[in-house]
Amino acid sequence: MRDKALGMPIVTSALTHGLGIVGDLFINPGDPVVLPEHFWGNYNLTFGVRNQCEIETYPLYCEGGFNSSGLGQKLLEVGEKSSKAVVVLNFPNNPTGYTPTAEAAAEIREAIVAAAEAGLRQVVVCDDAYFGLFFEDNCLQESIFGYLANCHPNVLAIKLDGATKELFSWGFRVGCLSYAAGGSGDLDAVHTALEKKTMGSIRGGISNSPNTTQSAVVRLLKNPAAAAQRKEKRDILCARANRTREVLDNGKFSDAWDVYPFNSGYFMCVKLKGGVDAEELRVHLLDKYGIGVISSSSTDIRVAFSCLEEGQVEEVFDTLLEAWTDLAG
């Protein structure tokens, strides 16, 4: 990032507010927003309902890894019917808990640049809500924003951060939005113009982000002990993720669901088998067994391993299997 031309980070009232700013500044009704098939439901509320975009999806996975070719194909398809698009890249992904490798990140950049070369103007949003929560060495260990900053005149990269998960600061509602335009002109002037538009949106929407929690985040970042404390919490999450993987490697679940690859973040997903509807299973699991999960599609169940003690993981999945069996017959 040292050699990149970047704008100044602008404080937002956490990451969701940053998404709302992006939508208000860059999305008109009917504009395409490109997402993987597994995406956070708030994107639909923010971009789909509020900004009335057209959501275009592609399969997230290909052969157990990120589907960079699928992204590239989708961008070319979108470019045939639109001159611009918003592309959202969310790693670690919510709901699946997947982060691509560095090799896949380079392929993502190539796909975006190829579409830009073909004439598609893109606003690429790097949603880094869960950044840093990586549990395998082969995960991309940096924001994909660095791959996309200044990559092409037709690409505007935007980095969104939030203290909530990155700094374990729930309820603070503090985040940042950063721009990196492409091209050979005066990028500082471009960034300044974008920053003024962004500050106008903030002023006209919420007036300002809360100063008290901003000050708390600054103190946290300056605290010499903060890095060790954050590592301690990440290690706890890593242990819970590893325990989840151990439990799910048991063949007893193979008739009920397949496990989507996961290596980071707060969550993981399973794809149900046997014709069991995910929402019906979610309600049944809650009503009969008192366990809460999320149905992210008609076939997919999201489990938050982040909130489970290691000793609870097996019980939760055993109970999920029991609930699935109730419905599968």
Describe the role of every protein-language-model region.
Residues 1-120, 124, 131-151, 311, ...:
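Conserved core of the PLP fold type I
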Residues 12, 58-60, 160, 294, ...:
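Hydrophobic residues at beta-strand termini and immediately following loops
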Residues 58-62, 91, 162, 211, ...:
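Active-site donor-binding loop signature of nucleotide-sugar glycosyltransferases
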Residues 76, 109, 153, 280-329:
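PLP-dependent enzyme catalytic core of the Aspartate aminotransferase-like
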Residues 86, 121-123, 158, 267, ...:
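Structural preference for beta-strand elements that scaffold enzyme active sites
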Residues 148-235, 283:
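Conserved core segment of the aminotransferase class I/II
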Residues 178, 269-271, 304-306:
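Short hydrophobic/aromatic beta-strand micro-patches
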Residues 211-214, 218, 230-245, 256-271, ...:
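Conserved glycine-rich beta-strand-loop-beta hairpin in the small C-terminal domain of fold type I
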